[in-house]
């Protein structure tokens, strides 16, 4: 089954509240739709007469080797998709040879994620009660997390008036399973909320707390990227939160080139939001990303077919990437650079494409 077929199957199997939550976008959904469209709009300049008999999609992310540059994004409420949640996702990552992000709102214990055998990074929402964040980070470190993903683009949930779907309530959903009921009760709903006062200083604080590299997720501006670097970030995820942050925001495909030029090689760059094909992944790598994070397609696959479904989608996209590499004349993902892209000095009059010839 393809990713699209897994999604269709998942929508048949899941209750409405789950499909509404998983598919929710901000506002009218324009950012989500444009994210995919902008990856599709990237144009390539293929090499010819290159030896592509042996292809290599392997790379490293913050020193961790992976067999594919397609990583698993941190996603909440995975128990609503599958009764093993992130534990099943972790097994898929291990079987594929990739890495996964694990949400602050993970539905299973960190120990169950670690048992899956894949390298993993812990995604952090900094809470108003800072002690809760400290506890979560310490427990993630104790269970083998190799890095922290600091999500900075979701300061508050969008009000239901903006998009009722974004507030879909998943019955029985897990909230911060890696905190005890007593810890959650002591903090209250106010303490578990995202802290809107955090600034760039939080990057250094998290690094000092954990001794782990900190990857900042949700950057769409070059000046913000530079400030993250100055604050000690080891990586940046150029992301629009899958279109769930702000309806008319800039897309990662548009933001990535500027950010890549600004930070140069000072940090590793990653991208997410709207990536659906091997061509999209190749475009992101050529625009400056070292790897990409994939979200919803894997969540739908998890719901439709468990860990095997997730692995099937990851394998499918990696095979698609290999095909694109073959057609571009590059044998290794490290060769996917701006050299294979259309440049501003080679404009294409898109409106003229596919127009019928004029006669008379």
Regions found by a protein language model. Give the residues of each.
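Short, basic, glycine/proline-bearing loop/turn elements
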Residues: 71-77, 119-125, 188-189
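An acidic-aromatic loop/edge-strand motif
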Residues: 325
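Active-site-adjacent helical/loop segments in soluble small-molecule enzymes
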Residues: 329
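A gly/proline- and charged-residue-enriched helix-loop-helix capping module
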Residues: 94-133
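C-terminal helical cap(s) of enzyme catalytic domains, especially alpha/beta-barrels
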Residues: 35, 251-262, 302-322
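An N-cap/entry alpha-helix motif that binds or orients negatively charged groups
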Residues: 1-66, 160, 168-199, 334-336, ...
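Active-site cofactor/substrate anionic-group-binding motifs, chiefly glycine-
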Residues: 60-105
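Alpha/beta enzyme core
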Residues: 77, 90-91, 128-271, 278-300
């Amino acid at each position: 089954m393809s990713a699209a077929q897994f999604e269709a199957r998942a929508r048949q199997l899941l209750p409405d509240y789950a499909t509404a939550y998983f598919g929710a976008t901000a506002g009218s959904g324009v950012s989500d739709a444009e994210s995919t469209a902008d990856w599709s709009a990237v144009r390539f300049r293929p090499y010819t007469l290159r030896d592509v008999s042996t292809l290599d999609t392997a790379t490293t992310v913050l020193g961790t080797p992976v067999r594919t540059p397609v990583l698993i994004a941190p996603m909440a409420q995975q128990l609503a998709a599958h009764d093993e949640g992130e534990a099943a996702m972790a097994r898929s990552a291990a079987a594929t040879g990739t890495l996964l992000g694990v949400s602050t709102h993970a539905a299973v214990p960190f120990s169950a994620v670690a048992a899956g055998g894949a390298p993993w990074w812990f995604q952090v929402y900094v809470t108003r009660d800072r002690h809760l964040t400290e506890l979560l980070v310490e427990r993630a470190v104790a269970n083998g997390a190799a890095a922290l993903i600091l999500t900075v683009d979701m300061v508050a949930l969008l009000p239901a008036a903006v998009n009722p779907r974004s507030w879909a309530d998943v019955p029985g959903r897990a909230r911060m399973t890696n905190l005890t009921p007593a810890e959650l009760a002591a903090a209250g709903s106010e303490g578990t909320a995202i802290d809107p006062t955090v600034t760039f200083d939080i990057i250094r604080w998290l690094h000092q707390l954990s001794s782990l590299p900190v990857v900042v997720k949700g950057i769409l501006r070059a000046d913000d990227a530079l400030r993250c670097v100055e604050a000690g970030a080891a990586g940046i995820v150029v992301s629009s939160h899958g279109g769930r942050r702000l309806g008319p925001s800039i897309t990662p495909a548009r933001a990535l080139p500027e950010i890549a030029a600004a930070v140069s090689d000072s940090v590793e760059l990653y991208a997410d939001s709207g990536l659906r094909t091997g061509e999209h992944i190749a475009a992101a790598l050529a625009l400056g990303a070292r790897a990409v994070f994939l979200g919803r397609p894997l969540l739908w696959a998890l719901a439709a077919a468990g860990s095997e479904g997730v692995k099937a989608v990851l394998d499918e996209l990696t095979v698609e990437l290999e095909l694109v590499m073959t057609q571009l004349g590059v044998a290794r993902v490290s060769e996917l650079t701006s050299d294979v892209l259309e440049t501003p000095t080679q404009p294409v009059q898109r409106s003229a494409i596919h127009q019928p010839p004029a006669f008379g």
